[in-house]
Design a protein with these regions (language model features):
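Extracytoplasmic/secretory-pathway segments with low complexity and glycosylation-like composition
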Residues: 2-4, 12-16, 21-129
């Protein structure tokens, strides 16, 4: 009887240990590095914890948006682990200096009626002359 109690206690501890160690699924993250960049210098955009499910596409659309303009950076494929990386260089004459937002958008569908639901994340990027 005592042996059964010890075995159950150890099994409970193991279950609890794995439950604590398992990563929690959270919202998608977007990061931009560096946050301040000069024209004609490289910028790296990274995403993590983006959904990889049947209702979402695997391609994220990346844009630069300011108060007056919007510029398509390109697209990046979400890997099986929910991450993506894209590098770009803001070119002189195409993008002006100032405060911009890097916008990542992933198209998903509603599981009920198939209507589009977009997952959008934004990060500020300061472009210097």
């Amino acid at each position: 009887m005592r042996r059964l109690a010890v075995t159950l206690a150890l099994a409970g501890c193991l279950v609890l240990a794995f439950a604590v160690a398992a990563p929690a699924a959270g919202p998608p993250f977007l990061s931009v590095s560096p946050k301040r960049v000069h024209l004609d210098h490289k910028v790296t955009i990274k995403g993590s914890q983006w959904p990889v499910i049947e209702f979402c596409r695997r391609t994220v659309r990346l844009r630069l948006e300011s108060a007056q303009n919007a510029v398509l950076i390109g697209f990046s494929r979400v890997k099986d682990n929910g991450r993506f990386t894209r590098q770009f260089t803001p070119k002189t004459g195409k993008i002006g200096p100032g405060k911009w937002k890097v916008v990542a958008r992933l198209r998903c569908e509603s599981g009920e009626d198939g209507s589009p639901n977009f997952i959008v994340r934004r990060k500020t990027l300061r472009i210097l002359p």
